[in-house]
Swiss-Prot record:
Organism of origin: Helicobacter pylori (strain ATCC 700392 / 26695) (Campylobacter pylori)
Molecular function GO labels: ATP binding; ATP hydrolysis activity; ATPase-coupled transmembrane transporter activity
Record-linked PANTHER family: METAL TRANSPORT SYSTEM ATP-BINDING PROTEIN TM_0124-RELATED (PTHR42734), MOLYBDATE IMPORT ATP-BINDING PROTEIN MOLC (PTHR42734:SF6)
Keywords per UniProt: ATP-binding, Cell inner membrane, Cell membrane, Ion transport, Iron, Iron transport, Membrane, Nucleotide-binding, Transport
Gene Ontology terms describing biological process: iron ion transport
GO cellular component: ATP-binding cassette (ABC) transporter complex
Keyword Membrane: yes
Name under which the protein is recorded: Probable iron chelatin transport ATP-binding protein HP_0888
Keyword Ubl conjugation: no
UniProt xrefs under InterPro entries: AAA+_ATPase, ABC_transporter-like_ATP-bd, ABC_transporter-like_CS, Metal_Ion_Import_ABC, P-loop_NTPase
Residues given in the record as ATP binding sites: A35, P36, N37, G38, S39, G40, K41, T42
Family named by the database record: Belongs to the ABC transporter superfamily.
Amino acid sequence: MVLEVKNLSFKYSQKLILDKLSFSVPKNSITSILAPNGSGKTTLLKCLLGLLKPLEETEIKACNKDILPLKPYEKAKLIAYIPQVEYYAFNFSVLDFVLMGKATHLNLFAMPKAKHIKEATSVLERLDLESLKDQGINDLSGGQRQMVLLARSLLQRTPLLLLDEPTSALDLKNQALFFDAIKDEMKKRELSVLVNIHDPNLVARHSTHVVMLKDKKLFLQASTPIAMTSHNLSALYDTPLEAIWHDNKLVVYAL
């Protein structure tokens, strides 16, 4: 397993948000987190990254390493992260922003070399972003920034990628391009993905595994075909839902 989580609990102002979650992310998989609104999906990702401190009984291992005591630059060698759309304090050019993905591969104060710039440009081309390379990151649309964040994460070349609602600002074309780029990368090297996503249809189309959360706890973990059933989805969302598979594609609708 690339990621192993045991007994993850988190409190905010004495209010329990996550209660003893235990789950894992297999190698070369896309594992989706599916849960009702307000279930702590983003909080979970921030706990995994060390941006929030879980309770003491929590154990988190990435690539068999206990990541809770690791320093930020050590975690950055294991985990890349794409947050929900945000602005940045400095309006870096897109190319310079993407090159930051190479920071963990360089010595302190070292500048990117020509090979790194070539690699960054190649990633931008793959994602149809080359024309934006000289623009400021804050001058882009939300969807464009998400694609640039993906480019930076791919350049980081970590074994684990965490995504928080990565397609919420993307149109249908770029949703497909986003996940196709990840799947292409998975064919080239070992890469596992944990993604917080709200659309069951996207989960079914792109995920190999699903983690469902409900009432602060783990509700279900299974492979996508086993998890994404009418019974499980209706129980998860407390509303009657019909899930129909056809040609390996899922359609979910309310009854």
